[in-house]
Amino acid sequence: TSEGHFWETINAAGVLQVPLAVFVWDNGYGISVPKKFQTTKSSISDALSGFQKQEGTNGVDIYKLKGWDYAGMCEVIEPALQKMRDTHIPAIFHVEEMTQPQGHSTSGSHERYKSAERLEWEKEWDCIKQMREWVLENALAEEEELIKIEEDAKEFVKQSKLAAWDKYSAPI
């Protein structure tokens, strides 16, 4: 969101009324830097507010969502995408309060730039943890089912990693 091609794309979509959905997944940082040093107004949706469609003009629709709120996201995204398809008004989804437990790159730990408070918040509001709690609270699955799914997923990743390494290591 800090580079020219992002802004050019949003501007062109707003001018031409292209049915485009753009999702900005915001964990509060931009390449290891707090967004207050990376984004005007510390919010991409606030910075984009001048692009907001008004009566009788072109532009885009802007939606703010919380990444850990699956039900809330569904309530907003589904009708917004339908509106975008029907009207060709581009939609920008600013998904805030995302967690990123591994940081932005492999060059160093995210613990070097996130405060202890932020790291604790991320443990509590981890999107996967929140989704799991939502599934259980809404009786969409039992604890045992989720444990089995998680175990199967870990095993699948482990086997896929081994298979990829074998292919990489094999002679050409």
Residue ranges and their predicted role:
Residues 2-171:
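Glycine-rich ThDP/TPP pyrophosphate-binding loop and its adjacent helix/strand module
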